[in-house]
Amino acid sequence: MAVADLYTLTNSRDPLTSSNDFYRLRQYGLYGSIQLDYRRWSFLNITGRNDWSSTLPVDNNSYFYPSVTASVLLSEAFGWRSKAVNYLKIRGGWSQVGADANPYQLATVFTSETAFNGNPLQSSSTIGMNPNLKPEKTSSIEAGFEAAFWDNRLCLDFTYYKTDSRNQILKLATTAASGYTSQVRNAGHIRNRGYEIQLGAVPIQTSKGFRWNLDLNYGANSSKVVKLDDEGLITSYQLYSSGIQILASVGEAYGTLFGTSYVRDANGNVVVDANGLPKISTTNKTLGKFTPDWTGGISNTFSYRSLSLSFLIDASVGGSIFSNTNKTGKYTGVLANTLSGRDAEHGGLWYYTAAMGNNVRLPESPSYSVSSDGLYYAQVNGQSTRVYQDGIMVEGVTESGSKNEEVVSAEKYYHRIYSIAEANVYDASYVKLREVALSYRLPRLWTQKLHLQEASVTLTGRNLWTIYKLSLIHISEPTRRTPIS
């Protein structure tokens, strides 16, 4: 509150903003399905749906999307059931999913603005609408198998999938000479393919009521932006920009990180300028992708009679994360990792500034005195000279290829890497203890008195421990998502 104990909305320290919007759309749909089975071991499911949407033009407002799935129980069809083999199943499917546009994407209209001198004003949108929009379409294929062995003590589930999303409705940048800065278009073809594996096991089960359930899962997904427009003129689409760009770039994985980088020589060494500071690339470069290479998890549940203890560990390997927090924290010097080089105690080098303005490193810690205003002075070449202990020598090479020997102040160094996006991109891999739960199932005598069939009390803890991570920053789920598929 701006003023204590004054309970009104206008008394908020952060003033509230509000707006009025009204959207209307009409959508109709028809759906049908057919389910067939043969001798209870072969199954076929067919579905079809047709939607009509008012947000699409009359010629394209109807879109149909079907699906077909089939499965065969091999253990039943060929009589393979035994004590060792309980269940074998193969399955496959193909489907399409359609989607319409947001309301009012077909025609450019005027919007009301603040009145001028009592006269109402209206303005035209800078977004060019499209009267020829088509519905989005996503096609998917999937295949897999399931198996269970030894009285279901070991279960396996494998799935392979591929999805293609086409005709995505995007706002693409256009030349301002057209009167608009962007235009709504059907664009974008993104392909995802991958596989998922789930393994369940009961390693221990005793007659006295002890049971150990183990579940493992693993998944890997590969995405690729196939194209953004039919003409091939658009090569990238910006999803987000703040210190770094997140792009959908043709030929690359969805969610590419794009930004400034260190200038490096042919051997990968950082190149410094004449002052000893890292050089910044003049063009943006690919710095990684925010999607992981694979994810996985391990779940264990130990139960004994009415008690059970479970814990879940999950992992994400690969992918990159950009930290605006670290970027700003380095510039302002509020992060603990910016202590490095800021004084001699934290590895800072002693130096003085020569008459020509260049910094000269002192060979060792000088015998210095401190003035009343906290400045350091030492004898250099027989003269009392102001000296500094916040020197950093960047590990790299000069433009001529020789080893860098220039000293820069820690402040200038951290200010320089503020402008280098690569310096603030981190490996997003982690392994976490995601959840621990302890449960107690109440005795049946108690639940019967409460007219309950069953009840339990559970103590749960989540996100308790980051077991492994490469970067110094806290890694969790992304805080900004702007998907186009």
Language-model features: locations:
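Outer/extracellular conduits and scaffolds centered on Gram-negative outer-membrane beta-barrels
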Residues: 1-5, 22-31, 35-38, 43, ...
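Outer membrane beta-barrel transmembrane domains
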Residues: 9-12
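Thiolate-centered catalytic microenvironments shared by cysteine-dependent enzyme domains
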Residues: 17
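P-loop NTPase nucleotide-binding/switch module
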Residues: 116-122
